[in-house]
Amino acid sequence: HFSALNDTLTNRQTCIIESMCKMYSYTGDKEILQKAGHIWDLFSMNGGTKDNEVFIHGDMVSSKPIDVHGVTAAEVSKQPLILYLYTGRQEYLDAALGFYSSVERENELPDGIPASYESLFPKHAEALHETCDISDFIWSYGYMLMATGDVKWADKMESAVYNAALGAINKDFKALQYFSSPNQLLATEKSSMAPYGEEGLSRQAYRPGFDVECCSGNVHRMFPNYISRMWMNGDEHEIVAALYGPSEYRTEINGTKVCITEDTSYPFSGKITFRFALDGAPVRIPFTMRIPSWVENAKLTVNAEQPKEYHAGGFSTIERRFKDGDVVELDIDMKPRAEKRTDAGINVYMGPLLYSVDIDENVEIIKDQFKTSVAFPAYNVTPASKWNFGLPENPEITVVNTGKKGFPWT
């Protein structure tokens, strides 16, 4: 199949490169990898092809502003990243770094996903993003993390999942928004700020389906793309805790089965406990944990020994002979922070979470419209309390811990 492909592909057709590289990893067939690189080189290098929308190599490297469908931006731009992982060619990584620098500078909203009214759009206070883009940029950020080892991409993945992704779906996963916004006041069948005709007016409401079905078919990728990067591997049996959340990791090292259980209420708490269970003799493991870039300081303790302090924005490694029953505790300092944005907004964060005003809601349940049913209804949501508040540039923020535990999204 791959050998029969045309060498000249256009835009999202080049996404087959990801599958070609994966097949190479299974087979070791160098011709597949060479053809994948050749397809991208023809498409992007030396001026690219005439059908290339925004992926000319020189434009990507120079971080030129981008005007293209958001999904196309996320899915095509990760192809040089994947090629870099398999070939080590620096020019592939340079193209992706320049491209995502432009997305961050021109388009990225407070929840980690770029503004996209189908096409990428300049960021502003009321800007929207398509739910497809949430899934796809999380996917691409995962490859950026693999390629660069830079914690900023893990930070973006957490921001996108814990804010944009979970804000765009209902708790029961039966309804979603086509367009969502960090600064949204209405979610009704007539409220979309990017209407795309009469049928498109409902795209900011929570519904099981829309006039087009791309987001309903793509939303399932959000969490697998996150979970598949929570635990990663390095060289020499290195185990990397890259993204945080309750989880379990199992592997085998030199004949010893190792299970690491991560206990945490992150992102609501910075206390993360890793419990090691081994079924045999102690084994030497480089165990690496991410220290997010928003942290002022973090403390790391092994078996309740004297803690060590770490600073923000890197990966910290403990290399030791781990034995059954060992406990590693990471305490990430979560302090509220107010960040002023270039679009005149002020965002309030604590840890990876973007905070908002708690607004009372009026909820109308719709069961008799096209693509709705009793089992899968749609919802019109409007505010039932005041929402029009402003913040000073340097607000004083007090954290009140109510003692609640668990995850409010489920």
Predicted regions and their residues:
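Beta-strand-rich binding/interaction modules
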Residues: 282-302
